[in-house]
């Protein structure tokens, strides 16, 4: 709330401004709507009835006032930076991730390929729902490596400097998910799904945990927010859960162990 007071007159400008470079790429700096989006995320996680009502209100405010639109084509903007409320830029991201996101023939075996069958299940392609989903489509969400499998394109190198080495932390799409869960209004889920390429033929009539699980899984594929959705809902299992943990996920699995440095130096 204090941030909201200080940022009340924040002049958000998402585009380039040659006369005032500071205003350009506002999504790379904490701004009014990034602060509000973070507040909505925290309130949703806290989960009380008043928290949910406020989370829904704030999410709808961000959707209506931030000036950004949901990405409908991620061929160039694979990480959906054009709808990002707050992001980081990592100069050496491509070098750091090269061994994991590497489509070259020289791959040493550490690259993160997924099988077509696993991808089809994750994005609901087997039921035809996600066949045109840009988060899945080859050349859009996924790279088709032939016999090697498929790979998420979010972290692959690009020559487009606008989208190069960007690491989104909060995107507009998450506000639609928060609004849907907090208010129970399926229209927000359908708006997100339609923008990503899912036909209105498959529109949902209600917001269920199963529907939210599917959309979080697809929207944050190869990202971290899906983990926190699973933790927040105390999910006992998830898509492609290891057989040894199927139906047995508990708070123990949802708490990261302390690092060795923290144990040693407190």
Predicted features, each with a name:
Residues 1-102, 113, 126-266:
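Acidic/polar-rich alpha-helix caps and helix-coil junctions
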Residues 106-123, 130:
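Short, cationic low-complexity segments
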């Amino acid at each position: 709330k204090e941030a909201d007071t200080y940022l009340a007159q924040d002049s958000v400008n998402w585009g380039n401004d040659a006369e005032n470079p500071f205003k350009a790429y506002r999504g790379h700096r904490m701004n009014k709507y990034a602060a509000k989006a973070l507040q909505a995320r925290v309130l949703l996680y806290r989960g009380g009835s008043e928290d949910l009502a406020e989370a829904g209100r704030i999410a709808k405010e961000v959707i209506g006032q931030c000036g950004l639109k949901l990405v409908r084509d991620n061929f160039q903007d694979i990480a959906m930076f054009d709808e990002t409320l707050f992001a980081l830029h990592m100069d050496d991201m491509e070098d750091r991730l090269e061994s994991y996101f590497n489509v070259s023939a020289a791959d040493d075996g550490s690259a993160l390929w997924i099988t077509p069958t696993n991808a089809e299940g994750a994005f609901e392609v087997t039921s035809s729902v996600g066949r045109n989903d840009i988060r899945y489509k080859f050349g859009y969400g996924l790279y088709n490596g032939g016999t090697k499998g498929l790979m998420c394109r979010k972290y692959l190198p690009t020559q487009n400097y606008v989208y190069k080495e960007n690491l989104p932390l909060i995107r507009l799409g998450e506000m639609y998910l928060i609004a849907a869960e907090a208010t129970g209004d399926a229209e927000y889920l359908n708006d997100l799904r339609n923008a990503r390429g899912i036909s209105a033929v498959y529109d949902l009539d209600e917001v269920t945990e199963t529907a939210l699980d599917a959309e979080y899984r697809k929207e944050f594929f190869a990202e971290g927010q899906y983990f926190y959705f699973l933790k927040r809902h105390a999910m006992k299992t998830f898509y492609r859960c290891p057989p040894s943990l199927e139906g047995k996920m508990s708070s123990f699995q949802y708490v990261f162990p302390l690092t060795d440095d923290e144990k040693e130096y407190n």
